[in-house]
Design a protein with these regions (language model features):
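Transmembrane-helix motifs of polytopic, lipid-linked glycan transferases
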Residues: 95-116, 153, 157, 397-401
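Extracytosolic helix-loop segments that constitute the early lumenal/periplasmic catalytic or substrate-binding loops
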Residues: 41-66, 73-76, 80
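Transmembrane-helix signature of polytopic, membrane-embedded enzymes
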Residues: 8, 12, 92, 103-130, ...
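Loop-to-helix entry region of an early transmembrane alpha helix in multi-pass inner-membrane enzymes
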Residues: 72-76, 84-106, 125, 137, ...
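Short acidic/glycine- and proline-prone juxtamembrane loop motifs at membrane-interface regions
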Residues: 36-37, 133, 139-146, 191
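Short helix- or helix-capping micro-motifs
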Residues: 22-25, 124-132, 153-156, 182-186
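Membrane-proximal stem/loop segments at transmembrane-domain junctions that anchor or position
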Residues: 247-363
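Membrane-interface anchor segments at the N-terminal boundary of transmembrane helices
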Residues: 91-92, 319-320, 328-332, 336-419
Length: 467
């Protein structure tokens, strides 16, 4: 990162002031809006058992049993923090995440510097440090902050690797580092592996454009070894312990042998498009009752289907778990809905899920009602959520403009395909959560920085013409 270090030295006061502001914002979230709940306890339980018993597992009725529902990246981070600061010292974890995320913003700037120029890098750094959406997740002991850090580094070294190959220069070292950071990102969240096909696409373009194909082939080999090689011990462990082939983590956070309500998951996938339904329905199963009044109209196609669905939900509310017979009924309803309108299931619903993950107000960690559009119920919270959504839209539109006005070359193929691949994959999930798109923000903020430079150039040109 010699170019970035040189830029920081030339503009040390700017970077110092922005860094202080960014760290202050993150510490504000840590101490004002800490969010220690949900998956935090799962990660924490695994970390403690790993430390205390040497078992990567969960506590079940007082005993520790091995698990594969989470990859070892974030539990390993928590275990290290617990070993230094004490068990379940989540405040120390969140402060560490605030420091890590503040530093990660420099990598955002480095990506912008490689894609465009120094002014774009400075603008991207300012936008990144003051971005409340990534900053707020430092106040949650979840994998997002470290996942963003790993993906940012993988993007940076991948962009540098692409540029080196474009100039027919050896790039094995750069692609090796990119692969290691990609592996680290996968260990935080398995969907971060989507960066690898984006890298592969860029390498494929270079392979067919450049005469020196040996450099490209060697880069592909190094990338494959460094990104997938670290997964081998985890895969072997899962085979030895569970006798299953699982190089990542189970899709539905279930261990081998546990009952999985596939029919229920299929049913919600035929209508669920927004985060509020995830909170009110998806996360309730199993253990909490479902309020049928909170189901949207799109969850039903016919009156008989409506009555059958409510009857199944009523039975679930009596026992608060889904048994195989009930799951089969959900599957039958889902199958009929899919047959009734296959295009809705394949095209329209995935599109709406993607739109919700990108555009809804990112207030899920704040004390703001999820049903933000119900102004009559909570007017102040709704106006705040609307402002938050506007700020999110501002970042996205700025990134879109930055992409359109910049000449990114094959590096652009890499970063844009990463966003498109991630969006396409996540649209196939039945539970759209806004946090799933945060790993795209290194690209969003880097391109947004380029947009501001173009605006500044236009203002200067207009001023010169006026004078």
């Amino acid at each position: 990162m010699a170019k970035l270090i040189a830029l920081v030295r030339r503009n040390w006061l700017f970077f110092l002031l922005v860094t202080i502001a960014g760290l202050a914002l993150r510490l504000f979230f840590v101490f004002r809006y800490p969010h220690v709940a949900g998956d935090t306890w799962v990660y924490g339980d695994i970390a403690k058992n790993w430390l205390d018993h040497g078992i990567f597992g969960l506590t079940d009725n007082g005993a520790v049993r091995p698990t594969l529902i989470r990859l070892p990246g974030y539990p390993g981070f928590l275990a290290a923090m617990f070993a230094v600061f004490g068990r379940e010292h989540y405040t120390a974890v969140m402060i560490a995440q605030a420091l890590i995320d503040t530093n990660t913003c420099l990598v955002f700037a480095a990506v912008a510097l490689e894609l465009t120029n120094t002014r774009a890098a400075k603008a991207a750094y300012l936008l990144a440090e003051l971005c409340p959406f990534t900053a707020s997740y430092t106040a949650a002991p979840l994998s997002e902050t470290l996942a963003i850090c790993c993906v940012s580094h993988a993007l940076y070294y991948g962009v540098r690797g692409v540029k080196a190959l474009e100039h027919d220069a050896p790039a094995g070292k750069l692609w090796g580092i990119a692969g290691l950071w990609s592996a680290a990102g996968i260990f935080m969240r398995p969907d971060n592996g989507l960066i690898l096909p984006a890298m592969g696409l860029a390498l494929l373009v270079i392979f067919f454009r450049k005469p020196n194909k040996k450099h490209v082939a060697f880069a592909c080999l190094i990338l494959a070894i460094t990104s997938l090689g670290p997964l081998v011990p985890w895969t072997v462990r899962n085979w030895r312990v569970f006798h299953v082939w699982q190089p990542l983590a189970s899709r539905y956070a279930n261990d081998p042998g546990e009952f999985l309500p596939r029919g229920f998951n299929h049913w919600v996938k035929t209508w669920m498009v927004d985060f509020v339904s995830v909170e009110e329905v998806y996360w309730k199963v199993s253990g909490e009752p479902i309020d049928p009044q909170q189901l949207p109209e799109r969850a039903f196609d016919t009156r008989p289907e409506y009555e059958k669905t409510l009857a199944v939900i009523a039975r679930y509310n009596q026992q608060l778990y889904i048994d195989p017979e009930m799951d089969a009924e959900f599957e039958e309803i889902a199958r009929l809905r899919e047959e009734h309108n296959p295009l809705r299931y394949v095209i329209w619903l995935p599109f709406l899920r993607t739109a919700d993950m990108w555009l809804r107000p990112r207030t899920e960690l704040l004390d703001v009602e999820t049903r933000w559009w119900e102004f009559s119920q909570h007017e102040k919270e709704s106006w705040f959520a609307l402002f938050w959504a506007g700020l999110n839209l501002f970042y996205i539109l700025a990134a879109l403009r930055g992409w359109l006005v910049s000449r990114l070359g094959i590096a652009g193929v890499f970063v844009i395909s990463f966003i498109l691949l991630r969006s396409f994959f996540l649209s196939s999930l039945e539970n759209p959560e806004p946090r799933y798109m945060l790993e795209c923000f290194p690209v969003v903020l880097a391109l947004a920085g380029a947009a501001f430079i173009r605006v500044r150039d236009a203002v200067k040109q207009f001023s010169n013409q006026s004078s």
